[in-house]
């Protein structure tokens, strides 16, 4: 399976004072998986095999619930093409 990019914006329904704390738990989990990722101010973009990345999205929902969110809204963007696509080929010239 070709390399793709998945961006995840996760919005757990928790008290404002806990929002960053819960999102940080999700980012820590993403980091622990070993996939290439970049954290942005509005979303985290990951690079890898689509099945692996979608499993990470699923687990990220579960982490929010485990952390006390009554509801989780997520916006997921997928960039997938034959032959694969990397974050570097899209934004490398800006680094």
UniProtKB/Swiss-Prot annotation:
This is UPF0045 protein CPE1503. Belongs to the UPF0045 family. GO terms for cellular component: cytosol. The lineage of its organism: Bacteria, Bacillati, Bacillota, Clostridia, Eubacteriales. It comes from the Bacteria. Gene3D superfamilies: 3.30.70.930.
């Amino acid at each position: 399976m070709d390399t793709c990019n998945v961006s995840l914006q996760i919005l757990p329904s928790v008290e404002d004072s806990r929002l960053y704390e819960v999102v940080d738990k999700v980012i820590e989990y993403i980091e622990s998986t070993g996939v290439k990722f970049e954290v942005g101010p509005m979303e985290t973009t990951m690079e890898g095999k689509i099945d692996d990345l979608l499993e990470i999205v699923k687990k990220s929902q579960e982490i929010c619930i485990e952390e006390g969110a009554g509801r989780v809204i997520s916006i997921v963007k997928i960039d997938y093409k034959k032959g694969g696509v990397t974050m570097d080929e899209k934004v490398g010239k800006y680094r």
